Amino acid sequence: MRALTKRRIVSIAEFSIHPIGTGTSVGPYVKRALQAISKIEGLEYQVTPMATILEAQDVSTILKAVEASHEAVRSMGAKRISSTLRIDERLDKLRTMNDKTESVSE
């Protein structure tokens, strides 16, 4: 993961992508989606077993990552894609995904 710099706003999102009609294994599709989002400037991400956590200075960067993921999965021949996106845009103070995790493990 790339190091974060201080900034005014941080948007954190939980994103998962699911190709439909491609069989039971989605690993290759998720891998291709991750390759696509790794190229998005200003985006940090953390892979978890059920979703990927995205972090950026603005929501538009997160949406670019979602779009890039869909394009990557389409390029592999998926005819239908379902995705889930949940965004937390905190405006009152700087909180990163690591801060949020640390605050509940103290």
Task: Please state what every model-predicted region is.
Residues 2-106:
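Charge-rich, low-complexity N-terminal segments
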